[in-house]
Amino acid sequence: MSITKDQIIEAVAAMSVMDVVELITAMEEKFGVSAAAAVAVAGAGAAAEAAEEKTEFDVILKAAGANKVAVIKAVRGATGLGLKEAKDLVESAPAALKEGVSKDDAEALKKSLEEAGAEVEVK
């Protein structure tokens, strides 16, 4: 009983990106070839797939900027922290403000903080 090309394709399609990378490496070693071009194409596809799959984002305050008071107010409003905690968080930048939030919430938080003068990154 032999395996058909379609069965192999289905098996590879069901694998995770890391499993596919390991499979390619093993095939390169087994057959003594280099799949550098194929890896680059697969890597680009994997990066796009990973970006689509990401549903939780972290909002990082990189710097408070010139208007620290406005940034502290924005942080308090977004996080529910007290004045002292928000001030400490802003002064300890770079610091994580919120972790595991949706893309829409992360972008809204980033926008409000940037309007207050902060430098913000969404990861």
From Swiss-Prot:
Top-level division of the source organism's lineage: Bacteria
MF term (GO), any: mRNA binding
Keywords from the named record: Ribonucleoprotein, Ribosomal protein
Pfam families reported for this sequence: Ribosomal_L12 (PF00542), Ribosomal_L12_N (PF16320)
InterPro entries: Ribosomal_bL12, Ribosomal_bL12_C, Ribosomal_bL12_C/ClpS-like, Ribosomal_bL12_oligo, Ribosomal_bL12_oligo_N_sf
Coiled-coil boundaries: none
Record's subunit section: Homodimer. Part of the ribosomal stalk of the 50S ribosomal subunit. Forms a multimeric L10(L12)X complex, where L10 forms an elongated spine to which 2 to 4 L12 dimers bind in a sequential fashion. Binds GTP-bound translation factors.
Function: Forms part of the ribosomal stalk which helps the ribosome interact with GTP-bound translation factors. Is thus essential for accurate translation.
Family statement drawn from the similarity comment of this UniProt entry: Belongs to the bacterial ribosomal protein bL12 family.
Protein's name in the database: Large ribosomal subunit protein bL12
Organism of this sequence: Salmonella arizonae (strain ATCC BAA-731 / CDC346-86 / RSK2980)
